[in-house]
């Protein structure tokens, strides 16, 4: 109540001065009266495509009310339509990191309380909004290239996106080096944050700007963007060798805090 939602500018009154434009008085409510035209503060319902379906970014969402995350204290349930709307709203932030890159997807078609599985390759009936990327000696991978592709992942119950660190459209050419901080079960997240600052400082001492990404779990990724043009590009083997050398150097500096051979139980 009192909040302005999804306002739209319609134009200026050319027949009056600004001082003459005032808010019209509120008419008494009459349930028998003819319904008035909707105002610009009304949120339009989602477009419908057949019984029980909605359309988001041009993608038909079946079973939009299916609960993917159950309600918990203070938080309502999150539905498949909610997930699709989130992908649509966050596309500008997500696509620079996943767009046109082979992407593995953790899917939970029946929600997080049901069965989940890891999808790397195209499956029968894959949504046409997802691009297929050929990778040498492997089956084609799927990749979102636009907002519709992200929403299509939401339609399939895709909850996590794990893109390759390659140049867009070029799976054999890395465009980043990623250091995966995978904490021991007994470590607090504050310890992981502190470790990420150590790794970031080490990289910046090598004149390599880096940034930190959350992973969806307890770990963090420290990412170094690298050039992928014809003159500067490296191979995946070179990428991995460099990452291993830096990781070993960090472990040697602080062997009580880091290991490169952690095996989770």
Each model region followed by its residue ranges:
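Intrinsically disordered, low-complexity regulatory tails
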Residues: 1-55, 60
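A residue-level signal for conserved active-site and pocket-lining positions in enzyme catalytic cores
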Residues: 2, 87, 179
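Active-site loop/lid in soluble adenylation, ligation, and acyl-transfer enzymes
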Residues: 52-175
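Short histidine-centered catalytic/ligand-binding loop motif
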Residues: 70-83, 180-192, 231-239
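Long, contiguous binding/interaction regions
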Residues: 92, 148, 155-163, 174-196, ...
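Short beta-strand
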Residues: 105-108, 210-216, 259-264
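Helical (often loop-to-helix) elements that flank the catalytic cores of nucleotide-handling enzymes
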Residues: 121-138, 188-205, 224-258
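Short, conserved phosphate-binding/catalytic loop or strand-edge motifs used
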Residues: 214-224
